[in-house]
Amino acid sequence: MGNEGDDMNGNDMNGSDVRTAFRTCPLCEAGCGLEITVKRGPQGETVTRIRGDMADVFSHGFICPKGSTLKQLHDDPDRVRRPLVKRNGVHEEVEWAEAWAVIADRLPEMMARHGRESVGVYLGNPSAHSLSALLYNRSMLQALGTRRRFSASTVDQMPRQVAAAYVFGTAVSVPVPDLDHTDFLVIMGANPYASNGSLCTAPDFPGRIEAIRARGGTVVVVDPRRSRTAEEADRWLPIRPGTDALLLAAMVTALAVDGLIAPGDHVAPHLQGLDEVVAALAPFTPESVAQATGLAAGEIRSLARDMAAAASGSVYGRIGTTTTGLGNEGFGTVTSWLIDVVNIVTGNLDRRGGAMFTMPVAGAPTTRGKSGTGKGFAIGRGHTVSRQLPEVMGEYPAAAMAEEITRAGDQGIKVMITVAGNPVLSTPNSLQLDEALSELEFMVSVDMYLNETTRHADVILPSPSQLQRGHYDVALLQFAIRNVANYSDPVLPLDDHQPDEWEILAKLGLIAAGLGADAEPALADEVGMRSMVQSSVNDPSSPIHGRDADEIVSALGDEPGPARMLDFMLQTGPFGAAFGANPDGASVALLRANPHGVDFGALQARLPEILRTPSGTIELNHPILMADLVRLHAAMDAAAHQPLVLVGRRHLRSNNSWMHNIEVLVKGKPRCTLHVHPDDAARLGLSDGGVARVTSRVGTVDAAVEVTDSIRPGVVSLPHGWGHGQPGTRMRVAAERAGVNSNILADHTAIDPLSGTSVLNGIPVEIVGVAVAAV
């Protein structure tokens, strides 16, 4: 609860020039609470200290190095604070009215001339960490009316969501490991000591891993790298990249042979196709996959038996399993599905200590509509022009973006809008996309930086800093290990004439709809708000079904913006106040009165109500997933004979291409180095500190070599998100530590056909030493 003398956000307002604000860190998926000291001065308010919020109900004071640098991010002199318009190849500062006028003059006209499908949109990863972007990107996209939507999802988590959608019915029906109660945790392709966790919102993930071991549990890491997480685990299995699905399939077969398939009485009545799945996996034995995976058959059997014998357990996989591939073929979706299969056959789905489902406080597709049944999931409502790649979850593969600009002829993308993204560094065959963006007729970017992507934009619209925005993790709390909620109002006020992020996105949509440069963002907000309310009062499953829509809108107040929409979502969510029906329930008012968050309890069993499949069961044998086993089996022999392959890696002080312009986070020993095992270094004539030329099918980079035994032989590692300092960018610190762009090596044709996700781990490469300085 807020202290006496605090304002509604817990700010100390006792007449001092210093106040304390609380908010959730928006820089990764952990959702840690921050305590922020703000001082008033002649030039306004400034942040003087950021530390972990000891009273936060979820993070209990934990903070990583990134969270403490929100002040440096806000104060960064390279952060764009006024709109930029490109004239004669140079970006110049202009007033907001002029920037809007340029967009209003060009965007509608080009849409009319080329058609709505001439517009492409790319939504970057930070959009998932922004309340405004999550709520108002939708209205912008609707106004644009284009199906050519791309995002970071297809270089990230899309396979995990597709697998969940086929099996459980929605793309957010992703089981998360019950970290605080599990006895046996298998971590595949993830390094939460560096990433803080992903698709598993859990502040202090490292501490929770240590707690598992402290209470007598076991932690196993399956990863070609001996990451920091692997170093802290009980067991490290250095698997060959791209073969995670083979390991999981063989675990199921080993359990079947031992008679240990036991989904449990709580799951079995709701389970479809278990016997069929087990039979289909029978060819994948520990012996048959041993050579391909690089793991002994005995190790595979032991892992399966140990998990089955544990009182509770969970397999958790992340980007190493979703962006995994063998050669030119991605297997992220089938790998994600097999994670669910292993959790199910060991009896660990939907029970304490196993893999459980969150009950999101602000609601989700898993809490709305008729429970226990639904429409299910399908892909392919549209296809790309150049390669006929199917739509997945309303978007096309990011790997197809460049060719949709350059190789689609009259049907190509002519206009691009990017929101909080840097795909020139984060998508496959990056040089191809870099060149393609230069061919656009018009480009608009909503971004805080003039970076490798936005340098191509004709207009850059700067969003306010993270400290100037209200925050609630709508997306990430759908995958939290507890049912928690935490809202924070902006810590600092907007700069003079700076619109809020929601206003920028709403106005872009209004201009696209032909309403001109003077259109008021509040109009889009009101239309969106009324649409949400009307849909809910018409929904028989809604807690406000049958209520008067005008009454509900009136109760929400007349202050436009994301807080009002969030209030509606909270009040109509599973713990909601329901506009008076449950006075003690969730609302923005409740969260403002509790600035350290509200804990609505541990995860509870949700079967069968969480299901939204057409059959009303767990469709474990979904035909699309089953059919992909044929492709997996065909690739098994080739896996054992792969050439040298490249994988990525993360670092605690960065997040993808973010945060590289903050001195305190990038100082010290260079971290954009090529990790090479000593045996490979000797064979290739590489030396520690030397330079290696790394070549894939599509590109070449020169990287500094770091010889280390923390990676298995035959595998090299290069972090992603680097390659800064290109002409036209304005990121001084990042340019001084540019590194190299590993995605130049990623093949844009290598994707997982079920999800459209790129292969970023397991890229075949050739390496030679070079006698030149690394770039």
Which residues are covered by each model-predicted region?
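Acidic/polar loop patches that form or flank catalytic/metal-binding clefts of enzymes
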Residues: 48, 149, 262-264, 300-301, ...
